[in-house]
Amino acid sequence: YVVNKNVEGVINDLGAGIPSRFTPINAKTNDEELSIGVKQIYQGAWNPIMGLTDTYSRQIWGIISDPITFKHPFTGETFPVRAQWEVETSGLDKKINVPTEAKMWNPTVQKWENVSTETFATSKVTFDFKFSNWHNGEVMDMNDILHSLYFTIEWGTQIDEKDKTFDTEFTPRAAQSIQTIVAINQIDEDTVEVYVNYWHFNENEIAEWAAIWSPVPWELTAAMEKAVMDGKVSFSRSGATSKSVNWLSLIV
């Protein structure tokens, strides 16, 4: 990679190298603009569900969106970006009693339901989110978090063959991610408890596993979902091919 001698703060990520999100975020120049040249134009559709599949679109997306966690460029350890957390766990053999006010989305009856008594989980992670404004000026809030969990559960569960919330690529992936989620309990306007059946000797890895976040406003995800359910587009490339519709892109 070639870097102008007047550019400082280039980060050589041990995994991603110089083109990681840390370089454009950390770089300093004598100008107000930072010019970055790429070899090819992006190839993946511009949607955060099953688009952004190539290196170049991922590099752009990594600059203009925030994850809830990320990996340290030199150590590979998980660190917080959009939330602080506190992990409670006693290992694989001991369980935590989940409070009955905790909820989970039920895709069969299409509503949030409280968990039953005597519900247990391996770990509890309390997330204190760092909300700010979306690019359109709207303030982030708990609706974005809850809708993200709804979306993952709804699309990760195929009720029957006529289920419209099914994608050939995304549904199997979402189904795997929801297997260990037990419940979510909203504490206040920016704090939730997430209960999971997962353990790791590093508590930050438990937090990353339990993390619930949305890179876009919930309204945007809902609009994309409606377009897909109406049969106009598909979240994934294979879904678009099988249904003979366009691969959903928010900018084309």
Feature-to-residue mapping (PLM):
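The feature preferentially marks the first beta-strand/turn patch immediately downstream
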Residues: 1-252
